Amino acid sequence: MTGQPYLDLPRARQARGQVALPGSKSISNRVLLLAALAAGRTDISGLLDSDDTRVMLAALRQLGVELAEAGEGRVTVGGAGRFPVKQADLFLGNAGTAFRPLTAALALMGGQYRLSGVPRMHERPIGDLVDALRQWGARIDYLGQAGYPPLAVGEGRIRADAPARVQGAVSSQFLTALLLAAPVLAQGSDRPVVIEVAGELISKPYIEITLNLMARYGVQVRRDGWRTFTIEPGAAYRSPGAIAVEGDASSASYFLALGAIGGGPVRVTGVGADSIQGDVAFARTLADMGVQIDYGPDWIEARGVRVDQGGRLKAFDTDFNLIPDAAMTAAALALYADGPCRLRNIGSWRVKETDRIHAMHTELAKLGAEVESGPDWLRITPPADGGWRDAHIGTWDDHRMAMCFSLAAFGPAAVRILDPGCVSKTFPDYFDVYAGLVSGAPDSYDD
């Protein structure tokens, strides 16, 4: 679908079936970096095949890491604890899950590196991470606007004499980057490596993923609430031998949403009650909206209303600080609520692949919703009866915008998704999987 200018979505009426989820983006790129930094060989299964993971794989190859891809999400990584190549020019696209952690790891190892990305990556802030790394003696220079990529990383005087203090309110990826890289510093230190969080930490479930995976690779992090994180001197990553990547819980949200408005049942496999991903909590949000949710150890199932027959979801007023990615799916579902819906504490949307608050406001309004927004909130009043409007939905080069607005096909309007190929960032065949679950009246938009 890459390069296809638009996709016209047939009117959808019902959704049912089962989906085996692609691997988690958050877990995939963390596991790749951990395997590269660990002593020993790691056999990875279930790795996500997407733009973001390809960016990480390409960067690790440039840095001299031994990689063998066997297809179907299987990759073997030969880790050596440090990157063999000490000088490289890395292009990291718009992959924050690659750019931030690699910046931290390279800064603590030392060498001569240049890190850059697409124009949007150069608009995404990184100053809080750079400031924290400089407290450990890292040498990092901005090659453009201060506080933003591209970056030049040089040889610093690395030491753990004092804690690194990082702001927690902009992106949890800054803390994740520091945590993942901290054992590089701890290996040669005679004192603990300490990270302190200033302000409110957002997206805590993503930090839980990081800590869980670090433990799988032999490094235990001691934490005092969400304020202080300590890695003991001499800590070093060791390969677990083999590791399986869970299905992507953020991607699960779109299919569970289909079950919520298309009757269902829709079951996703690869995540469930035992998942380490915070976005599984989206299922509880659906339950609050009146959707029947059932769980197994590695599956979740949704049975909801038929909006094409007049069914409506319960309106919500929810703090989405912990699950900002899945919150986008909730915003799209607000089109089918029985009253105004409010999404709170979503300020991190402003610095994602696009300004998601502005983008979501713009595109929901095209469909006839009444939308208000602020620095960290959205208020959405569903289109009135007869108030839906045909729309060409801009995706803003944001994979999640494209996937969320596939849900608009259940409304009484013609929906065209522009640049549908942007889903390749995390889910290249999303629209094929979507089509396998949805049934309706193709090419007809009359009630």
UniProtKB/Swiss-Prot annotation:
Predominant cellular place of this UniProt entry's protein: cytoplasm
**Where are the coiled-coil regions?**
none
CDD domains linked to this entry: EPSP_synthase (cd01556)
The residues annotated as the active site are D325
Query: Which residues are recorded as binding 3-phosphoshikimate?
Result: K25, S26, R30, S171, S172, Q173, S203, D325, K352
EC number(s) per UniProt? 2.5.1.19
Q: Which domain of life is it from?
A: Bacteria
Gene3D superfamilies noted in UniProt: Enolpyruvate transferase domain
Q: Which reaction does it catalyse?
A: 3-phosphoshikimate + phosphoenolpyruvate = 5-O-(1-carboxyvinyl)-3-phosphoshikimate + phosphate
Chain residues that bind phosphoenolpyruvate:
K25, G96, R124, Q173, R356, R400, K425
GO MF term (any one): 3-phosphoshikimate 1-carboxyvinyltransferase activity
What Pfam families does UniProt report for this protein, alphabetically? EPSP_synthase
Q: How does it assemble?
A: Monomer.
**Annotated NCBIfam families:** aroA (TIGR01356)
HAMAP family found in the cross-reference section? EPSP_synth
Q: What function does this protein fulfil? A: Catalyzes the transfer of the enolpyruvyl moiety of phosphoenolpyruvate (PEP) to the 5-hydroxyl of shikimate-3-phosphate (S3P) to produce enolpyruvyl shikimate-3-phosphate and inorganic phosphate.
> What is the protein name given in its UniProt record?
3-phosphoshikimate 1-carboxyvinyltransferase
